[in-house]
Amino acid sequence: MQLILLEKVANLGNLGDKVNVKAGYGRNYLLPYGKATAATAANVAAFEERRAELEKLAADKKASAETRAAQLAELEVTITATAGDEGKLFGSIGTHDIADALTASGVEVAKSEVRLPNGTIRNVGEYDVAVHLHSDVEATVRVVVVAA
């Protein structure tokens, strides 16, 4: 399936690239989320007319992500959770909890932007958490988990 990318897609290509992808990936992900359009002659011509507008939009998104990353770099978030005597939490701290704490601190962060490669946080302590704001912009936030 031939598609034209309308924005940068990780491990696939940049804005305006003509890519050949499997039909399921194109139909179920790229097309519904507005990340690509079918590479027909009419769509190619329409894309070339809108290219400057889309490039400006992509640059604005990246600039916005960079300002949010600068705000997040200065931030340290404290999350209080109930824990046992040895510092093990009753439950866990996940991406949703971290995103809510960051949003409460004044920087809007979606749950899907928070990355926990080692899984949820299950112990009291300090953790460095990656926040993936844009395909080119990633920030690290210090999360402190304290016992209630």
Swiss-Prot record:
Family stated for the protein in its record: Belongs to the bacterial ribosomal protein bL9 family.
Keywords: Ribonucleoprotein, Ribosomal protein, RNA-binding, rRNA-binding
Domain of life according to the entry: Bacteria
Name assigned to this protein: Large ribosomal subunit protein bL9
One of the record's GO molecular function terms: rRNA binding
HAMAP family, A to Z: Ribosomal_bL9 (MF_00503)
Keyword Magnesium: no
Function in brief: Binds to the 23S rRNA.
GO cellular-component term (any): ribonucleoprotein complex
GO biological process: translation
InterPro entries on file: Ribosomal_bL9, Ribosomal_bL9/RNase_H1_N, Ribosomal_bL9_bac/chp, Ribosomal_bL9_C, Ribosomal_bL9_C_sf, Ribosomal_bL9_N, Ribosomal_bL9_N_sf
Pfam family, any one: Ribosomal_L9_C
